[in-house]
Amino acid sequence: MDTNWLYVLLQKSTADPLERLKLGNVILNEISQRKVSPHPKLVNDFLDVMSGWLTGSNFKVTIIGLEILDAALRTSPEVLASYYFDRLSVLIERMGDAKVQVREMAINLCRQLAYLENSSPVMLLDRLCVHGTGFEHKQWLVKVGSLNILRDFLSDSFALVIPQAINLIPQLCRLTNDPNSEVRDASTNCLVDLMVFGGKSIIAKIANTRILNEQKMATLLQRYESTIATRGDLPPKHSIPIETSSIPRNNLLRRSLRSPAKIIHPSASTTSFTSSARLSTPPRTNAPSLSPSPSTPSPLSLPAANGRSRDLARSSLRAPAGMSLSRYRSSSCAPAAQCAITLDDFKKAFNAVPKISIYSNSDVREKLETANSVLRNANEDWSKRANQLKLIRSVILNSDDSIDQRLLLSLINELADALEFSIRDLRSQIVREAAITCSFLFEHFGMDVRNVAECVLPAALAQVAVSTKIMASSAATLTVFIVQKIQTRQIFQTLFDLSTSKSKEQRRQLANLLETLISSWDLKVKQPILKSISQLVQNAICDADGETRVAGRKAFAKLEQLHGAAADQIFRELDPAKQKMLRDGVSSSSSSLNSDRDNNNQKQPQQPQQNISQKFLSQRSASALDNKSQVLSIAKPQQSNPSRPTAMPVNNRLPKSSTSSSFSAVRSSGYGQSRAKTPSDGFGGTNFNNNNNNNNKSSSSSPSTSTHQTPIQRVASNLGSSSFVASLTQEQASSLQNAMDLAKDEMSKNNEDDEFLLAEVRKTPPKETSPPASLYARGYGNGSNGSNNSSNNSIQSVEHILKACTSSSINEKRDAIISLSQKLLDRNLDSLECKNIGDTLSRLLAEGNTTLIISILETISIFVKCHYKKLDGWLKLALGKLFAKMGADSLPNVKSALSSTQKMFLTTFDPSTQLKEVCDFMCDPVHLLAPKSRLALLEYICLLFEEIWPEDPRCLERQTQLDTPYTRAAVRKMFAWMFDPRIGAILMPACERLVCALFALNAADFTMIFGDLPPECRDWAYRILQLNGQQQSAQRQQIMEKEAITMTNNNYKPCPPEVEKFEKVSVKASFSTYEATRVPEPQDYRKPTVHLAKNHVEQAAYIRNQMDLMRDFQKPDRVNEAMANLHGMMCEGSFTLWNQFFDELLDEIYQILSTLSQSIRKKLAMRILQKMCTAQATKLFDSTEIAISKVLQCACTSEDNTMSVAAEDCLRILATHLPLPRIVQISRRILSQDDDDQRGVLILKMLTRMFQDIDVDELHMIVDDVAPCFVSAYDSTSSSVRKCAVFGLVALVQRVGMPRLETHLRKLNATKLNLIDLYVGRAKSSESGTSSN
């Protein structure tokens, strides 16, 4: 056990929450892919550690612990289920956690635990009923969670938990008097559900407790009646007598202990019927050999003496020719296959019942009530129950007209629960007889017994997944009868919930039922749910199971035949591979579509070695691909394929007119794909007259081989060969033909699919190549004039460029962005194109591709500049993406591009519109911004208020109305952010600045807005304004003496009017912080130094003064202030004397990084070092090793936990600006000689980030030097070092490819290589998913 992976990881568990989070992520990744060893000590140690995590005070550790327990339960349920029950009290306690996420995860884990093998909801409820826990816990949240679990069990497993629920009625009634309102509501809901499911007997039981007063009882009855009324035709289904409830429970408990349970966990994605699957599955029995004789009588009509052996004989499958018997036995039964029970067998068994005599209504009532009581009793002999099922059919068959039909139907509807219980039985004879009886009821009464159908359908679908063929096939056949005869919304909802089942047999049966539903249901019933039907068909086509996909393609063929528009929509949403498979599947399975395709296939022989696009386009008119195809089609002789079998005799094949022939070809070959204007359709343009059209049509279609041609037959053949068309008269057929011609005209227009498919053909022609520029210079219509060509070319070029922008290839995406920026210069783009372009640019901006971000930002600037009048609806989304990007760490050139793009937005759009959109985005709860992104948003609003570019006449003017609902909401949101202890310190300066700017812009509206805020917000705002005014009063005299002051921090520019100038400066010159208001004496604030950029004398004196202050380590405050002033100069661009002060300043920075004082802000020194490296990188070449060593020393010796983050940023700047060979040499020496894990982690992270930033050619040069370092680091004993090594190797594989690193990765074992492959696959899948979106 000492070498077990889980044991090794558990030994690293500590009390530090940060270490627990790191270790938890490693355990979660491993335990999601590996099974837990069944060693008792290991499992107990694992659960002890997790219990400690769950009972800790850090909720993040609790969440990761619950995720680990959930993943372990999914991978190793047979090992951990019993151990979890021993520690169930910990989960129950977590149900009362203060965090909603922790409570929900604990409740879901308890639900999952109840539906595992050797477990049941009964066992979990027993634990919740223990005194002091669950329903009697002192924490009200635990009570609410326990009540919610009980409600779920009542809904999903009523038959199992009804005895316990009845015993809990007094406790539930007492909880309705709980002091907490949520507990009272939850207990009331449980009682209402229990009344609905249990019926009048449960209502009487609740009333007999006499715990509830009359008012509460009346309220419960009222809610019960309203619930029944809202369910329409769904009366309570589970009215089980109380006096017999203990017998089924004991029996069910005995069954659950006798064999492993097969109950499926009812999660949010599973359905109600899967959760109520059968409790256990009997072992497989070797079936005798099946006799191939068709004269074998059906076992349904034989006596029950040897029914078991005959059932097993019937349950064997006859393997088709060419298929191995073992393989065929592994597939599940479907009603359409050769299963143990088929539709014909059911219909034959309908009348195979004993003869009885029915004399009166009371006789019918007596017999059916007897059958109901026998079927409900699980301890009754199975043969008696089977006879009672036959008796039900016999009663119906032998009832004459004197029997009251309403009485008969009411008695049959009362059998719903008994029949459902029989369908779930463990004996195949009972399941078969119950399925036959239910099918007989649906066949005989139809919609009158829909309640029975809705009750037994979940049970039947659950039985489809069992391994016993006779039971699975009986249930599958029953579902076919239900779907055929019962057409209600509840039936479809049950089927829709089955789409998320994990059982491939159930999903396969659903696909088969979809075909039946589409073909048999009435149009009025299907119309409201047609979109959901299409979704199910699409899910079946894309299913992981091959047989399910085949059934899904058959359902698609039926859907295309009856609802073409829905089928076209499905086809357009599928990828090309699925489309090709769908075409092949439909053409081979749909008889309604074979006629046109058979004709097309017989007209032209198949060309060898065609690619996918050519095979797809072979169904289309050749003139849609090439202008020369018309001549080729005329010159080519007519051929037919004599070897292809025909669906009907040759003399029955009717001729088709040219118009309908082309229409049907387009309609059946593409399924919603391109319908282009072709000369063969008669819409070529002015270059083709009617005679040419007729010639083309006759040349592109095979001559008719029929000798019997009548006008009515000719018209009918144009429309198809169905019975409906054959019944039309000449006038009706002609009218229908005209309507179809008009529809064909609309469908023959070019669309996106034409552009996509034809562009692919032009890219890779079979014999000759064309330059890429022809893609934009050629038109796609064959007979259109020049103007049409240019118009279509412009539209389709934009669409093609946008599709290329979503490519996963970086080079193709880069070329598409360049083409798009050129296309955007055309100001004639319509609104739809602008909308598509805006959506594409938003997705590109959100991808986070560092290599293309500058090109994307430049393209967005051009787009905004040229088409801003059409982009009001896109402004909110674009600003949100821009704020998110500005909040991320990026290189200086990227920040400059972001600033330029932001300025383009500010100077182009109307300021009032910008303010409204930004405020709406700020208050939208859907958008969750990072702290730095929130800071960028607040600064953007400040820029709108402060008139950064007063030369723009559209800027916000003074006295602009700001008292609007969206401004009020934004101010409240700002205070919510500011008072957040996690991010308030970051946002405080921007909030102060925003308050001052708002007051300066419109003081009256400022007073109205802040008058409705809480007192603490008003006091803070007024204090900021007062303090700001006091600070500025001392500076007004200096401002008046100077002729002009330019605020160069891109935050202020004074307006020409002198009075306004003083008003603005008095408010905007500088801002304090909230902490400054608590200091009695005002502090000195840093003054802008932009005016020193050109005055070298004053600049040198200022820098010398600050550097003298930096040398006084005895006064850390002065050192920090001096560093802040110098850093501010560098940010403002006023530090220009690099040659004079660079070496001296670098020496001071090194000394600060080396000092052991914790009062000096070393992170600020690192930022200064970054600025120096960015501005004068060549001066640091000689001291590269010293700079890296100082940063590493500072990060490793500091007590600040955030110092490592600043060190990572500094090392990344150094690595990307200093000589690459020196960086690699220093890194190798540190990794090989230094044993400090923290230094190794920082170096590995620096190299990993460098891999992502440098060019591929440079990376290829250093791969052989750095790859061995990462491979050796992968063997480190420190998990953090190994993690960084894995990430570095993954980054290398992504950039240079696996073959380039193959020689270095040979040293790793298979497990480590698999982990690298796993992370590389995840990175590629996430990248492709982002690009596709």
UniProtKB/Swiss-Prot annotation:
**Superkingdom to which the source organism belongs:** Eukaryota
Q: Which GO terms fall under molecular function for this chain's record?
A: microtubule binding
Q: What is this protein called?
A: Protein CLASP-1
Task: Give the UniProt record's GO annotations in the biological process aspect.
Answer: astral microtubule organization; establishment of mitotic spindle localization; mitotic spindle assembly; positive regulation of microtubule depolymerization; spindle elongation
At the highest ranks, the source species' classification is:
Eukaryota, Metazoa, Ecdysozoa, Nematoda, Chromadorea
Q: Where is the composition biased (Polar residues)?
A: 612-644
Bias class Low complexity marks the residues at: 269-305, 601-611, 657-669, 686-707
**Is Repeat among this UniProt entry's keywords?**
yes
- The main location is cytoplasm
